[in-house]
């Protein structure tokens, strides 16, 4: 799921993704936006 959080690295996405999807969520930075995924 792409969320409306700007990023330059996946580390910036980890907290918002975990906040939204729980502690097992993963995060990537794609095209300057965070992408969350559940493993």
UniProtKB/Swiss-Prot annotation:
Residues in the signal sequence: none
Residues the UniProt record annotates as site (Aromatic residue of the functional dyad): 37
InterPro entries per record: Scorpion_toxin-like_sf, Scorpion_toxinS_K_inh
Domain of life: Eukaryota
One Gene Ontology cellular component annotation held by this UniProt entry: extracellular region
Family label: Belongs to the short scorpion toxin superfamily. Potassium channel inhibitor family. Alpha-KTx 02 subfamily.
Domain remark from Swiss-Prot or TrEMBL: Has the structural arrangement of an alpha-helix connected to a beta-sheet by disulfide bonds (CSalpha/beta).
Note in the entry: Negative results: does not inhibit calcium-activated potassium channels (KCa3.1/KCNN4) of human T-lymphocytes. Does not inhibit voltage-gated Shaker potassium channels. Does not inhibit rKv2.1/KCNB1 potassium channels.
Described function: Blocks Kv1.3/KCNA3 voltage-gated potassium channels of human T-lymphocytes (Kd=0.71 nM).
Designated name of the protein: Potassium channel toxin alpha-KTx 2.8
Native species: Centruroides elegans (Bark scorpion)
């Amino acid at each position: 799921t792409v969320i409306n959080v700007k990023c330059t690295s996946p580390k910036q996405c980890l907290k918002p993704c975990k906040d939204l999807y729980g502690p097992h969520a993963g995060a990537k930075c794609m095209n300057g936006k965070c992408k969350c995924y559940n493993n």
